[in-house]
Amino acid sequence: MNLFEKMTDQLHETLDSALALALHHKNAEVTPMHMLFAMLNNSQGILIQALQKMPVDIQALRLSVQSELNKFAKVSQISKQNIQLNQALIQSLENAQGLMAKRGDSFIATDVYLLANMGLFESVLKPYLDAKELQKTLESLRKGRTIQDKNDDSNLESLEKFGIDLTQKALENKLDPVIGRDEEIIRMMQILIRKTKNNPILLGEPGVGKTAVVEGLAQRIMNKEVPKTLLNKRVIALDLSLLVAGAKYRGEFEERLKKVIEEVKKSANVILFIDEIHTIVGAGASEGGMDAANILKPALARGELHTIGATTLKEYRKYFEKDMALQRRFQPILLNEPSINEALQILRGLKETLETHHNITINDSALIASAKLSSRYITDRFLPDKAIDLIDEGAAQLKMQMESEPAKLSSVKRSIQRLEMEKQALEMEKKESNAKRMQEILKELSDLKEEKIQLEAQFENEKEVFKEISRLKMEMESLKKEAERFKRNGDYQQAGEIEYSKIPENKKKEEELQRKWEAMQQNGALLQNALTENNIAEIVSQWTHIPVQKMLQSEKNRVLNIESELQKRVVGQEKAIKAIAKAIKRNKAGLSDSNKPIGSFLFLGPTGVGKTESAKALAQFLFDSDKNLIRIDMSEYLEKHAMSRLIGAAPGYVGYEEGGQLTEAVRRKPYSVVLLDEVEKAHPDVFNLLLQVLDEGHLTDSKGVRVDFKNTILILTSNVASGALLEENLSEAEKQKAIKESLRQFFKPEFLNRLDEIISFNALDSHAVINIVGILFENIQKKALERGINITLDEEAKELIAEAGFDRFYGARPLKRALYEMVEDKLAELILEDKVKENDSVAFVVENNEIVPKIK
């Protein structure tokens, strides 16, 4: 076996890289220096692993070696065929072969090559590191193992390569504090202490804090707050994607995983954490190969491997419950979503970390708003993750504003720029008539430039104060970490000096600057560094498209005027509007059932009396837009099979991927008015679907996804019993009796019983009709004003239109047609004939029992 056949795969790759480097630099020979540079360029190699454990500037060392290579002689005609290994390189490989034999290795590994030739590289390494320290680090990485296979040195420190040491991160204070979840952490420790099957698996929805629980365990181990059995354990998060990545040959993945398992067994103090553990099922499997789950099973069963898994309930059901052999090796720990109060405690615990990261102050009101608003409005995600995201994004937005130029200063600069351009234009014209305007511009420019100087000085002053506060906060954080480190090492004198001398001194300076900053804020500061509930409401608004004011306290005052606001659009239905207003007020006061929709109403009445218009008016009032009205025409659901369109087609049927018309619309706009129009025309089975919505406030679609209706208002309109409502000879009691009879015929009792309110809309009277004419005319008036034409309609004309267009049986709809014929058509003719132009006024008056336009 020659020298090259005795090299490990990694050393062979290093030699190939050195050869490519020599070709690139046009060097005639490959030297040990080329080998060293190739090792420094391999981020996964043993040399880089060793240097990362030492206080070395790797980039500076790399540049130093490169400058040495640049000194070598260059040859113009060089190719792979005529390049040679120089004598020094061959000698260095022979040196490594000698050391290999002494160590009992079967192949020359990369670390052996380095150790055997440390003298060759000493001159270039000396300015950056101690050669003896490097030797010690390389030896520690080997851990006394021998190289018996060509790829054995690729698997040195498999855990370091494929995992992240969470206990080390906890030691360096790089993990966020873990608040609560004590029961789950204690249960996890109990399982880990067991003799066999000592593998807990954390189950919970995405964002409830599964990974945080494991980080909490790592922190407790570092703080020695665990049972004696778990002291000195290391929690290492295994990255499965790194294990699979770059596995070129069949069996390479399995070999890597086996090396990790062997390393864990040998060390006996490692707890493996596999996040998204369901990915081990099928991971790395190929034809004739084993997946990760089957490789792990024997070690898990014997208790040789301490593993903590984390996955969602859905993935656990899909992968683990099908494989009983894998399932029984893990002990499940269920993590439920925390309550709003528990989430608030978590946020308060994270507050300091987030403040330090973003260099801002987070008010407690922002934390409360984050927990409450995320719980109410962001229904498709889970606490505490969604609340933390809100705070984080709000803080990032504030930080961005802090680091940008204030809006007030930008506005002044833009005004100066605009006036300067206008001044130049006037100077070019040289007209005497421009003299007055020029004087005004010069005066404005003088004032604005003075204001700009003041604002810039204020901005710089505020920036300086804020910068100093930020520096002191960072200093405070590092002092706390230092004190913690001294305590852990038992140096209580140094820890005491920091805690009782340096920290109070730092705090005093910070408090003085904070008082100065608060005084600036009271005097109208340009910069704002405090995150408030308004900032959080803005972020929620960006995510959900719900207007900001709807989420804040001011909305409650607005709801008190709901009746008068709705009556501006819906006329002659005072009783119906009062019933709607009461339900909305109950909800806003927090007295209604939070597990049901905000309100569920059945609107009864003849056609054209304002049932659909009431739903539109409600959407406009609550959400400032008719777009938040989800309208579904129930006459499209006459057949039984059409019902599936509401929640989505069943698996295997056309349209399964598209989802349901009702469920998809509510998922996209969870805060809206849902209008089911002409509900009596739908198939009776549709009402069975609605029972769950009315009772529990949610509906499960064809894919098994739960759609939340708790923030919707459900309105059903129907023409049932419209005959009784139109009958003038019946008393109110007789009408109600007739309505109840009609409802019993069309709807099931369990459906009617779940509705909040059954509201009857009366037939319109003549007074209401005249008011409706006024409302409809306002729409035409707005369109005319867009063209610069002002139009008016007198009372007599309104009465004439009401008389011509109103029909008791058809409601207010024919009024639109009457308005088109008697007003709009005549106005259109005048515009097209150029008889009416911009800034003209047209009055529509009655002459000889006919409406005629009068141009002014």
From Swiss-Prot:
Region (C-terminal): 764-856
One GO molecular-function entry: ATP hydrolysis activity
Binding site for ATP 1: G204, E205, P206, G207, V208, G209, K210, T211
Entry coiled-coil feature ranges: 388-522
Assigned GO CC terms: cytoplasm
Superkingdom classification of source: Bacteria
Annotated stretches, region: NBD1: 157-337
Every Clp R domain range: 4-144
Classification via Pfam families: AAA, AAA_2, AAA_lid_9, Clp_N, ClpB_D2-small
Subcellular location: Cytoplasm
Region feature (NBD2): 555-763
Region: Repeat 2, residue numbers: 85-144
Oligomeric form and interacting partners: Homohexamer. The oligomerization is ATP-dependent.
Stated role: Part of a stress-induced multi-chaperone system, it is involved in the recovery of the cell from heat-induced damage, in cooperation with DnaK, DnaJ and GrpE. Acts before DnaK, in the processing of protein aggregates. Protein binding stimulates the ATPase activity; ATP hydrolysis unfolds the denatured protein aggregates, which probably helps expose new hydrophobic binding sites on the surface of ClpB-bound aggregates, contributing to the solubilization and refolding of denatured protein aggregates by DnaK. Necessary for surviving high-temperature stress.
Free-text note on domains in this protein's UniProt record: The Clp repeat (R) domain probably functions as a substrate-discriminating domain, recruiting aggregated proteins to the ClpB hexamer and/or stabilizing bound proteins. The NBD2 domain is responsible for oligomerization, whereas the NBD1 domain stabilizes the hexamer probably in an ATP-dependent manner. The movement of the coiled-coil domain is essential for ClpB ability to rescue proteins from an aggregated state, probably by pulling apart large aggregated proteins, which are bound between the coiled-coils motifs of adjacent ClpB subunits in the functional hexamer.
Similarity remark: Belongs to the ClpA/ClpB family.
Protein name, entry field: Chaperone protein ClpB
Gene name as annotated: clpB
